[in-house]
Amino acid sequence: MVLALNYNMHGVNIRSENAAKPHTMPSRYLCEYIRSIEKNGHALDFGCGKLRYSDELISKFDEVTFLDSKRQLEREQIIRGIKTKIIDYVPRYYKNANTVAFEDVDKIIGGYDFILCSNVLSAVPCRDTIDKIVLSIKRLLKSGGETLIVNQYKSSYFKKYETGRKHLYGYIYKNSKSVSYYGLLDELAVQEICSSHGLEILKSWSKAGSSYVTVGSCNAI
């Protein structure tokens, strides 16, 4: 999953929707984690991308909101083998689910029992956008709710990108076709980001090159 927005950094345009992985490439560990959550109620997939974890969230929670940029939600793409748009796919195949554009996140009033933010912060090359994401999570989380923030922090796959330009938490890498940002955020980096915005760190751990941090909001809804 990734919050698909366009960024202009150091004079180049970075399209973060290029980082969104299809539903055929989920983390088995994360799927199992979602199924094991004791909470129910209302869930938010913050940066839903190509709906990698939509089936697990729909099966687990009473209501689910899928959030990404307007561009990602409204562009035609292949979703679970179907050429469609996320804004059309979700109401057609999922009951008690809706979509919200990141551009409209401030209009959301209700709170969430669980928020998933998977591989979003690591794909955002803009500190202001990261701040807005974390502050939105803080505002939208119910009292007693939990947010799981997942990011990749090491992988041999990323070695070639280290030849790119160092930026924020990772590297800006350019090839013959496009320019991409690849961030690597370990537990400590995510904890520092969340703590600086008033979120309570509940638990953190690492698994297979990814960092997992669960947070609660000190002034939750």
Swiss-Prot record:
It comes from the Bacteria. It holds the Pfam family Methyltransf_12. InterPro entries: Methyltransf_12, SAM-dependent_MTases_sf. This is Uncharacterized protein YmfD. It comes from Escherichia coli (strain K12). The lineage of its organism: Bacteria, Pseudomonadati, Pseudomonadota, Gammaproteobacteria, Enterobacterales.
